[in-house]
């Protein structure tokens, strides 16, 4: 009897011990809250000049030795590899492993890397740190680990699903984006990564965010698959007042496309990581905003309460739309943010920045709350980000969606059948969708259109498109002042029934 009591006590002690210690976002939040109450300490670079001053081609020579991947000798589907410091990745981040019983720092060693032709003194790099890390997982085939997550630089991270290649990025937080005061880029200064079990299909990552005016604690649960979904929880604390807080920011690139053709001859018809901002507003409306590469900074704001979702999408997957064998823009994912709970009043904001080439991310989208708490008070945001190539499920299932937007010189067909430019700009917008395809060809589909004070709609026509089994809107617009932007909206209806999402377009200035 005494032996049974002793065994019971031992079992209870074991259960208590294993359940009483568990790392959580609250452990990170304590650090973030403590940091918020102190003055900001800028990170110090410990990088030798040979690495700090190197060119990108040299930095690319520094490769992680795949044979030394972290967890390589463990029966887990996830593996970790690390980024070396170099160029503007000049400050180290701390990376920790979380097990069932402890937290252990993953120490830097130059032995993890091959340096190619980069000459360096081993003694000068022995005490460096990592610039970031990547996660590998057998997402495309069971016998091969492929990279699915990259966390490198500021609070940026990139994620892909099966059959995808890296494109747009997500971020932890954006501060004062597009404001005259200049943008502040918070950075993840420390990570904690839970060691996965052999049967785990998800990976949990915690991160501590820091910047001059904000700190934060983050929990990312990565669920790889055909679509890779990242479940995000954040606790944010302001050190000082900010002009604008960008929550769940997405960063992408748009250089040119059919709504804004390339000014120079280019064999690629389109060049972009994303071609539109999609919004599912709190009132149920779906909005599609084609992206631009403007000549001047452009900011668009969509006010609403409790957004149901937003994302930067890559609509149109045919290779013929891109014709790029090297960069495979047709395989780059869309990213869709789904808020959890009520986010209150605020705006989905789109920032479009001029760029001359595809190496610059010039598109940013995020949620910005109308009201921010006083410094030190906690803000909580929960959401998922879905990285997908299946855009069919990223719009209203019962409404038509915009398949493409094309811009052209407006013209009128003369009696001799020759088209004569009439000083207008023509927009050709194709709508399609599963429900729309069921409509008879003679359905009296019309368009509800509107334009801002800087323009006039000269003509608007809708006709059936037998190729897409949808309807095509052609709208000819006259701009009053080319130095100003021109806003326009359109949606397809049948009597009092709305058939499509709302096409919302901004014609940039000086176009």
UniProtKB/Swiss-Prot annotation:
Family matches, as Gene3D superfamilies: 2.70.98.10, Immunoglobulins
Pathway membership, UniProt: Glycan metabolism; osmoregulated periplasmic glucan (OPG) biosynthesis
Main subcellular localisation: periplasm
Single GO MF annotation: carbohydrate binding
Localization of this protein: Periplasm
GO BP of this protein: beta-glucan biosynthetic process
Domain of life the protein comes from: Bacteria
This protein's GO CC annotations: outer membrane-bounded periplasmic space
Signal peptide: 1-22
Keyword tags: Periplasm, Signal
Function: Involved in the biosynthesis of osmoregulated periplasmic glucans (OPGs).
HAMAP family per UniProt: MdoG_OpgG
Family as reported in the entry's similarity comment: Belongs to the OpgD/OpgG family.
Name of this protein: Glucans biosynthesis protein G
Natural source organism: Shigella dysenteriae serotype 1 (strain Sd197)
């Amino acid at each position: 009897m005494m032996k049974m009591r002793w065994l019971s006590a031992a079992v209870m002690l074991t259960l208590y011990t294993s359940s009483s210690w568990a790392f959580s976002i609250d452990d990170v939040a304590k650090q973030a809250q403590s940091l918020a109450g102190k003055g900001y300490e800028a990170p110090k670079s410990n990088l030798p000049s040979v690495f700090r001053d190197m060119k990108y081609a040299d930095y690319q020579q520094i490769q992680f030795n795949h044979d030394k991947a972290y967890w390589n000798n463990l029966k887990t589907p996830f593996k970790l590899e690390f980024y070396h410091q170099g160029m503007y990745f000049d400050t180290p981040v701390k990376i920790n492993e979380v097990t069932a019983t402890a937290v252990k720092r993953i120490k830097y060693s130059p032995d993890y890397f091959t340096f190619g032709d980069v000459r360096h003194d081993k003694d000068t790099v022995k005490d460096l740190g990592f610039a970031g890390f990547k996660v590998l997982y057998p997402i495309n085939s069971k016998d091969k680990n492929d990279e699915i997550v990259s966390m490198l630089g500021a609070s940026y991270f990139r994620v892909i699903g099966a059959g995808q290649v890296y494109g747009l990025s997500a971020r932890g937080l954006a501060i004062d984006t597009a404001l005259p005061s200049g943008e502040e880029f918070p950075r993840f200064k420390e990570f904690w990564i839970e060691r996965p079990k052999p049967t785990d299909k998800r990976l949990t990552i915690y991160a501590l965010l820091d910047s001059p005016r904000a700190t934060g604690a983050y929990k990312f649960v990565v669920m790889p698959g055909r679509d890779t979904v990242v479940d995000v929880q954040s606790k944010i604390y302001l050190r000082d007042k900010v002009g604008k807080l960008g929550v769940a920011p997405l960063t992408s690139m748009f250089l040119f496309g059919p709504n804004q053709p390339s000014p120079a001859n280019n064999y690629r018809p389109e060049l972009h990581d994303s071609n539109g901002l999609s919004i599912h507003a709190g009132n149920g409306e779906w909005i599609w905003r084609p992206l631009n590469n403007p000549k001047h900074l452009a900011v668009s704001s969509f006010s609403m309460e409790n957004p149901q979702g937003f994302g930067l999408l890559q609509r149109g997957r045919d290779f013929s739309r891109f014709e790029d064998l090297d960069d495979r823009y047709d395989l780059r994912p869309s990213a869709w943010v789904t808020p959890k709970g009520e986010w209150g009043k605020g705006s989905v904001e789109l920032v479009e920045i001029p760029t001359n080439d595809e190496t610059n991310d010039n598109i940013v989208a995020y949620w910005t709350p109308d009201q921010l708490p006083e410094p030190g008070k906690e803000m909580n945001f929960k959401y998922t980000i879905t990285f997908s190539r299946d855009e069919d499920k990223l719009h209203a299932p019962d409404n038509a969606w915009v398949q493409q937007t094309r811009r052209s010189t407006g013209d009128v067909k003369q009696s001799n059948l020759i088209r004569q430019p009439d000083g207008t700009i023509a927009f050709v917008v194709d709508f399609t969708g599963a429900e729309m395809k069921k409509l008879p060809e003679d359905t009296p589909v019309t368009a509800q259109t509107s334009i801002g004070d800087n323009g006039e709609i000269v003509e608007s026509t809708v006709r059936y498109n037998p190729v897409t089994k949808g309807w095509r809107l052609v709208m000819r617009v006259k701009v009053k002042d080319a130095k100003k932007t021109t806003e326009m909206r359109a949606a397809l209806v049948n009597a009092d029934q709305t058939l499509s999402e709302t096409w919302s377009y901004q014609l940039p200035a000086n176009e």
